[in-house]
């Protein structure tokens, strides 16, 4: 267990690479000026109840020594988080079914490129500005030898929020959510690099981007791929 009950502000980084850590608790930590990196394949609980600001990246991983997803944490919530200066990444947590960032308004990117096929909920009701990309992709689990049977998420039916988004300077990429019924209301988006929607087999309705202007970045040209 990692627990710091009195720490309120950290001017540097937190870096933990440890396969024995099961519980993480920073009760009073509100501001981290640097980055946060946890790779903890035994993780069961991850609590930052008053954290509001991370200056650089916030990265939570569960890769084990076989380089596969691990950990038994089912629910992830950082309830007071409003700003991440770098990229917010949550990947390779094998049992994760829910993640919520209920007050997050601005981040340098959202990287959920290997979330579990059983993930049921992603809540981002207040997000407005993403200064990089939004990547949400369900795991393609390793198939048996000699076959290719992709495993896609067939339980997540809707994203919680994302209808306040105005700026995405990179791309939106959403892939392998075959039960998704409806996309967020993206009518407020004015700036967007590109958008890719792949293997969303049950989505209905109309994709509306009435105010969006596709703007190229140094790494990627404007693109709409459905």
Where are the predicted features?
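Concave beta-strand-loop units of leucine-rich repeat
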Residues: 1-96, 100-226
């Amino acid at each position: 267990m990692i627990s710091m009950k009195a720490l309120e502000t950290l001017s540097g980084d937190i870096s933990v690479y440890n396969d024995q850590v099961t519980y993480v608790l920073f009760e009073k930590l509100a501001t981290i000026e640097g980055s946060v990196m946890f790779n903890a394949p035994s993780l069961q609980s991850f609590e930052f109840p008053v954290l509001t600001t991370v200056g650089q990246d916030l990265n939570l991983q569960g890769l084990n020594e076989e380089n596969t997803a691990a950990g038994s944490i089912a629910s992830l919530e950082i309830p007071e988080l409003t700003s991440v200066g770098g990229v917010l990444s949550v990947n390779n947590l094998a049992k994760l079914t829910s993640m919520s960032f209920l007050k997050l308004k601005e981040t340098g990117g959202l990287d959920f490129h290997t979330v579990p096929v059983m993930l049921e909920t992603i809540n981002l009701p207040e997000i407005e500005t993403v200064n990089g990309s939004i990547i949400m992709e369900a795991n393609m689990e390793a198939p048996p030898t000699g076959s290719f049977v992709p495993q896609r998420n067939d339980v997540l039916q809707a994203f919680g929020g994302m209808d306040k988004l105005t700026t995405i300077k990179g791309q939106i990429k959403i892939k392998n959510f075959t039960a998704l019924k409806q996309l967020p209301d993206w009518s407020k988006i004015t700036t967007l690099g590109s958008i890719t929607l792949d293997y969303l087999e049950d989505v209905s309705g109309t994709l509306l981007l009435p105010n969006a202007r596709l703007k190229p970045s140094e790494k990627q040209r404007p693109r709409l791929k459905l």
